[in-house]
Design a protein with these regions (language model features):
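Acyl-donor (CoA/ACP) binding surface of acyl/acetyltransferases
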Residues: 2-28, 36, 70, 74-211
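Short acidic (Asp/Glu) patches
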Residues: 56, 67, 88
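Short N-terminal amphipathic alpha-helices
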Residues: 30, 42-44, 71
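Conserved GNAT-fold acetyl-CoA-binding loop/helix
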Residues: 39-60
Length: 211
């Protein structure tokens, strides 16, 4: 695999409100802008970085793309963020779940005026469905969700993710605690069945009421 370029794909995913299109080599301008915004990076990164050089931005996404699917998040045809579904790369997770196909979801809403409107949770839902229903994975994680970013944690919990482990950092670090959240294929299917039963029940009650 060539780490000098993005490993591109042809997959486009549709959510209720977002479209996830393939990330490409033509997206560096917008990716560089988001990765130069100190407020965006405060929430999306675990360290104290406030800006990144273009070559660093390119290196990050190109590396991730070798073992994952990288997407640009769009709303109404306009890019608002990025995300990926990647093969797990953290030993602390892999040692807990040996022999399992573990993936991780990471995302950034780079357009700050779009924060708090549900686009993050819709993106997570789309990637989760893709991971379980198309990739056939066993477990999907959100890794290192910081205590100062409760909005991100709530977005994953809204889709059914729960805390798998809490990591306590050294005093004085940016995040005192970080959380790994998990969703298994079994729990995902239970949710899908429950949603299907609820829809069927509501349809049945509506039919009874029309008689």
């Amino acid at each position: 695999m060539n780490g000098d370029r993005l490993r591109e794909h042809l997959i486009t995913l549709h959510g209720c409100r977002v479209v996830l299109r393939p990330m490409g080599e033509s997206d560096w301008d917008v990716l560089a802008r988001w990765n130069s915004d100190a407020e965006v990076l405060w929430y999306s990164e675990g360290d104290d970085v406030t800006s990144r050089l273009l070559e660093d931005v390119q290196g990050i996404y190109r590396e991730v793309s070798q073992t994952g699917f990288c997407f640009i998040i769009e709303v109404g045809g306009q890019p608002i963020g990025e995300c990926w579904l990647q093969k797990m790369n953290l030993d602390r997770v892999l040692t807990r779940y040996p022999g399992k196909d573990c993936r991780r979801i990471d995302l950034m809403i780079g357009e700050k005026h779009m924060w708090g409107q549900g686009y993050g949770s819709d993106t997570i839902s789309v990637l989760t469905r893709f991971g379980f229903e198309n990739e056939g994975v066993d477990l999907i994680f959100a890794c290192g969700v910081a205590d100062y970013n409760p909005r991100s944690r709530r977005a994953f919990e809204k889709i059914g993710y729960t805390v798998d482990q809490c990591i306590e950092n050294q005093p004085g670090t940016k995040a005192r605690y970080e959380y790994d959240l998990i969703l298994s294929i079994g729990d995902y299917l239970k949710q899908k069945n429950a949603e299907r039963d609820q829809v069927a029940g509501e349809a049945g009650r509506a039919a009874d009421g029309s008689r």
